[in-house]
Amino acid sequence: MSAQDKLIKPSHLITMDDIIREGNPTLRAVAKEVSLPLCDEDILLGEKMMQFLKHSQDPVMAEKLGLRAGVGLAAPQIDVSKRIIAVLVPNLPDKEGNPPKEAYSWQEVLYNPKIVSHSVQDAALSDGEGCLSVDRVVEGYVVRHARVTVDYYDKEGQQHRIKLKGYNAIVVQHEIDHINGVLFYDRINAKNPFETKEELLILD
């Protein structure tokens, strides 16, 4: 039984046990494009990936299943070398602590995503980045594009083009890196992890 066959079984919930860690060669491989129209197995895998993200952000389910919270997941992280990513970016409460009107600022499964253009300006998260496949803290600015335009297909096989900036742009670049065999710390300056160039936008 392949990793994908196991993951898409109706009774299976993706947990941290399914997520491979750095050192596994799948994380360093360039993933294959999925065939269109999508097969049922690839649609199911995308749904399972999104289900994992929702569980990971739900305090009750996360504790029950022992999950680390995540806003994105790429198929190679569950040992399936295909160009499929899921993103689930929650909206935060306002300054008064009131819950947001919409739970998520971005919720999507992207098939064969590709960055088709990007800004000259770079950006990095002030607190750095983490990864479900990396069980350690790696400090430093992960330098990425401040704005990106991404083409992708949804589960219906419809093509989309989306323009992203800020945190959502960082998230999609992190996940697209995964399908290209790149890990976030590859983008940290090894000699000077917190190097700031004049044009670097630091996002809080």
Swiss-Prot record:
Q: Which InterPro entries match?
A: Peptide_deformylase (IPR023635), Peptide_deformylase_sf (IPR036821)
Q: According to its UniProt record, which reaction does this protein catalyse?
A: N-terminal N-formyl-L-methionyl-[peptide] + H2O = N-terminal L-methionyl-[peptide] + formate
Required co-factors: Fe(2+)
EC number(s) stated in the UniProt entry for this protein: 3.5.1.88
According to the record, the segments passing through the membrane are: none
Any single biological process term in GO? translation
Major enzyme class: hydrolase
The organism's superkingdom is given as Bacteria
Q: One Pfam annotation, family name?
A: Pep_deformylase
Q: Can you tell me which residues form the catalytic site?
A: E175
The record describes how the cofactor is bound as: Binds 1 Fe(2+) ion.
Q: Which residues bind Fe cation?
A: C131, H174, H178
UniProt GO molecular function: metal ion binding; peptide deformylase activity
Q: Does the keyword Iron apply?
A: yes
Record keywords, A-Z: Hydrolase, Iron, Metal-binding, Protein biosynthesis
Q: Which HAMAP family match?
A: Pep_deformylase
The family database entries (NCBIfam families) matched by this protein are listed as:
pept_deformyl
Query: To which protein family does this belong?
Result: Belongs to the polypeptide deformylase family.
This molecule's function is given as:
Removes the formyl group from the N-terminal Met of newly synthesized proteins. Requires at least a dipeptide for an efficient rate of reaction. N-terminal L-methionine is a prerequisite for activity but the enzyme has broad specificity at other positions.
Question: By what name is this protein known?
Answer: Peptide deformylase
